Amino acid sequence: KARIHRIFPIFYDQYAIACFDTEYSTVTEDYPSQASAALKNIPSNSLAKSVLRYDKGFFLFLSGASIKENELNVCVALLSERFPESSVGVSGIHFRMEDADKALHEAIYAARVHKLNRKTLNDPSLYQAYSGIEIYRVLLPLIDNEELQQYSLGLLDPVLEFDAENRGSLLETLLGFVQCSGNLHELSARSGQHENTLRYRLDKIAALTGLNYRKMSDYEQLALAARVYLLVND
């Protein structure tokens, strides 16, 4: 508690944490100072705000007697626009100081998913909320598990070999398909490729792996392998 108070001296009943991963940002000045200065431009906002350096980015700590979603969104959106190349994740709202470590991890995990979505889907959203990362809640804490990684590589090896030998795009198609939650129409719209082209590649993946993306149990295996691959290679 004492450490948390040193980092965040103003602590109200509710709080949320945002993680700004600026690994690929072209901004070279001191991030926390810039972020703090930008937040001062918000004319009226009841939230207490603290900024703390984190790796190549920073954490934004927001606290208030009652956090309103629109106020939280204003703060996060402002800094997302200030650091446009950042991957940004926002934790859930927490109430106990003892849960600060959990909130930090939620923000980090959400930022990592935001990074994946920006890279594979050209996701235009300013940030990713932890509440929306779905299965990644389970995968991220386990991603260093060797058996999980071996499962992914074992399933995807035939696809990787085919792409290497034929300069193919099977893996790229599979990863995009999974990121679109198995929605072929959405993948076509995002990638600019005809559905028949994508369907041909997915059928080729089925022939190589023995897993038919049209069958739910098979799709779930492909999706797990693809998501693990994305996290390991992001």
Could you tell me what each predicted segment is?
Residues 1-234:
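Cytosolic nucleotide-utilizing catalytic cores of signal-transduction proteins
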